[in-house]
Amino acid sequence: MEYTLFESSPIFVGLIGYLVYFYFLKNEALQTGFRNYLSESKSSFYWIQLTRILAFSCMAILPLLYIYLLDIYFWEIDFIWTYADTKYTLILAALLIPLGAINAKGKDHLVIYPQVRMQKWNATEYNFNILSWGVYLLGYEFLFRGILFLGILPFVGLYPAVCINTVLYALAHLYKGKKETLGSIPLGIVLCIITAQTETIWTAFAVHWIMATNNFVWSQYYRMKENNNNL
């Protein structure tokens, strides 16, 4: 079955959305201007929350608006949680949670994480940070495992789709360093294969959110422990 460039264009819309988000994330002038309006102790928190909301808007809402407003029927979004999603999520979580806890101890890791740099957290901020991770990753996985994988399957087939997606996924991690970039390759392949079997984005989203939450909890713990040891 052949599809027109018009029908495939949400792929380009999604990629443009990601680039808009990335530009915003890495624009130091915007970040400095934003932080000037906030107290130094809270500026990191609010900046990160803003970037995550923007990411969801660019990677999910923008492509969805394009799909629905222009009636591109090929891009029907009907992701339903399945039993297979539950099974794969539990298996991967059991493997990745302890690995994440161990990895969070590393000094190189603590240079990057946790993303929000605050000495004092209250319960609302702590939980909201976890929730905003979920919002961000829902948009992220809608783009990467939805549009940029399930969306290109009809065009190129399974194995080329896995390769294309894995390359794009690795490129999206380049700014986080060599270790995360290399680590994204096997994870990306596994998530693509599972996504192809379930035909949903939910395992990828759930696993990614579990990993992010686990990483935040342990990175914050080890960072605070390191700070206390330096006193």
Give the predicted meaning of each segment.
Residues 1-78, 217-231:
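N-terminal, membrane-interfacial amphipathic/helix-forming hydrophobic leader that caps
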Residues 8, 12, 86-91, 127-130, ...:
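Hydrophobic alpha-helical transmembrane segments
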Residues 9, 43-55, 124, 128, ...:
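Membrane-interface starts of transmembrane alpha-helices
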Residues 12, 54-61, 90, 143, ...:
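Membrane-embedded alpha-helical segments of multi-pass membrane proteins
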Residues 26, 162-172, 178-231:
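Functionally important transmembrane alpha-helices
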Residues 37-42, 68-136, 150, 154, ...:
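Juxtamembrane helix-loop-helix connectors linking adjacent transmembrane helices
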Residues 61-69, 132-142, 192-207:
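Hydrophobic alpha-helical transmembrane segments in multi-pass integral membrane proteins
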Residues 108-118, 139-164, 193-200:
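Membrane-interface helix/loop boundary segments of multi-pass membrane proteins
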